[in-house]
Regions:
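Structured segments of extracytoplasmic/periplasmic soluble domains
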Residues: 75-84, 167, 171, 188-191
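Active-site-proximal beta-strand/loop segments in catalytic clefts of secreted hydrolases
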Residues: 58-59, 105-108, 137-139, 170, ...
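Short, solvent-exposed loop/turn elements at domain surfaces
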Residues: 63-66, 112-113, 193-195
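Active-site recognition of the HExxH zinc-binding catalytic motif
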Residues: 153-171
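Acidic/histidine-rich, surface-exposed loop or edge segments in extracytoplasmic proteins
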Residues: 48-63
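Metzincin-family zinc-dependent endopeptidase catalytic domain
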Residues: 67, 71-155
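N-terminal low-complexity, Pro/Thr-rich disordered segments
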Residues: 1-51
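Metalloprotease/metallohydrolase-associated module, dominated by Zn2+-dependent proteases
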Residues: 1, 6, 24-29, 124-146, ...
Length: 203
């Protein structure tokens, strides 16, 4: 297997931006074994509409402050630019087993196992409307994607919104025209297809 990727905490611009949850020396280990830890905590849904409860899980061994990560996930989902307007939803946080959505941060190999039969190639993430799980690949959380450059904060918001978008039933979209703002369901982890990168359903 490839050796772990390691970064000093400030080796890349944006690595420790608020909401990343990253702590200390950040090592991207290929496989941490798959033990998932539920981040404790609850918060009510702040908006109107259909309430979707969200449970946040972090794989044991990741250099992540789970509470900071969970708060960032819920802040992204409940942002006015998020899914609340187009889908009429609002998101609460729970640690209960009956959560309607699970957001999981996992090592590349664990992501592959959780996303199967979809082939994520240890590089990508997934969201599944049947299982209710949005699995975020930790390597992507740390490295971002080429078209986003150093804008890791926006990429992380994109990653949450895109994969939870799948959980909500949204499929992939294409860039409508070169230079246009990319719909959030474009596979921007691979390429923005000539569009401007965007992390939000309603930018």
């Amino acid at each position: 297997p490839p050796p772990p990727l390691a970064f000093r905490s400030r080796a890349r611009r944006g690595l420790e931006e608020p909401g990343s949850g990253l702590v200390g020396t950040v090592v991207v280990a290929p496989d941490l074994g798959g033990s998932l830890v539920v981040v404790p905590g609850e918060s009510p849904a702040p908006g109107t509409g259909t309430v979707r409860s969200v449970r946040v899980e972090v794989e044991a061994g990741l250099p992540v402050d789970g509470e900071v990560f969970a708060a960032a996930v819920l802040a992204t989902l409940n942002d006015p630019r998020g899914w609340s307007v187009p889908d009429g939803v609002t998101f609460s946080r729970t640690a209960a087993d009956d959560a309607s959505i699970r957001v999981v941060l996992a090592s590349p190999a664990t992501t592959d196992r959780l996303c199967a039969p979809l082939a994520t190639e240890s590089r990508y993430s997934c969201g599944n409307s049947v299982t209710g799980a949005a699995v975020l690949n930790f390597e992507r959380w740390v490295l971002g994607a080429p078209d986003f450059g150093d804008d890791l904060a926006t990429y992380r918001q994109y990653l949450v919104n895109h994969e939870v978008g799948h959980v909500l039933g949204h499929g992939h979209e294409d860039c409508p025209a070169p230079g246009a703002v990319a719909p959030v369901m474009v596979q921007q982890s691979i390429s923005a297809q000539g569009c401007l990168t965007n992390g939000w359903p309603v930018p």
